[in-house]
Amino acid sequence: MKIKINDYPTFNKEWDREKTEEKTDNMLKKIGKLQNKMFAQNKFSLLIILQGTDASGKDGVTKGLLKYCNPIGIKIYSFKKPTENEYAHDFLWRVHEVVPRKGDLQVFIRSHYEDILVPSVEKFIPAEIIDERFKLINDFEKLLENNDTKVLKFFMNVSKEAQKGRLMERIELKEKHWKHKDGDWDTREKFDEYLAVYEKIINTCNEIPWHIVPSDKNWQKLYFTAEIILKTLEEMDLKWPELISERFKSGK
């Protein structure tokens, strides 16, 4: 059954904010403990991919999710326009170079999906090359999972109205001026075109499923993503390493 992004809410009116935020904080504490165990075990890794339009809240949810995590085992990579050197390689070269090591929790703010998304809308790469990238990405993500890297993919589903409000804040609030880019407003004019490509990505690169996150409100977005990440970590075979010592015996 084809997934249609517009069938998914950007905001859930029935959620109680105070209760939701309390549940979220409890989940974040559990995520922190499990992430530390994963780092100590040094066997598995977790890759969290965050995609969404400009001002959908990818940076903010990253900050919230890692509140109680051990920073030593955390890596964050934000994908920008490819450099000249990156353009000289295949499109996955720059991605494979920064996937998580064993034990790490890695967050991709944007990802390899930008190499389908942007050229599809802006039309600077032939369609047949873009079509091939769908298969290559599916294969790449299977490779990661086959090597003990669990992959979670989130699409930050923000309404056009909420996006405009956040972009306006970057103009009006001094502490957010640094986030402003004129190009974000150019991209906004193609909001529906980008959404259509995202829909194709979600339906085609779906061997590892996508999670469509209601993102108009930061507290709802954080709850939704934390719940899935916690469930994933709980289902991984995470164990504290045994004591290695010739002098001491392991405690209970």
Model regions and ranges:
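Phosphate-binding beta-loop-alpha motif at adenosine-nucleotide cofactor sites
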Residues: 48-51, 149-162, 181-186, 205-224
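Charged, amphipathic alpha-helical linker segments immediately N-terminal to NTP-binding catalytic cores
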Residues: 1-26
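Pre-Walker A adenine-sensing motif
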Residues: 30-40
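A glycine- and Lys/Arg-enriched "phosphate-lid" helix/loop adjacent to the NTP-binding pocket
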Residues: 120-136, 144-196, 243-248
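Glycine-rich phosphate-binding P-loop
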Residues: 50-66
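Conserved nucleotide-sensing/catalytic segment adjacent to the nucleotide-binding pocket
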Residues: 14-22, 72-132
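NTP-dependent small-molecule kinase module
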Residues: 194-252
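Switch/connector loops and helix/strand junctions flanking conserved nucleotide-binding motifs
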Residues: 58, 85-88, 114-120, 160-167, ...
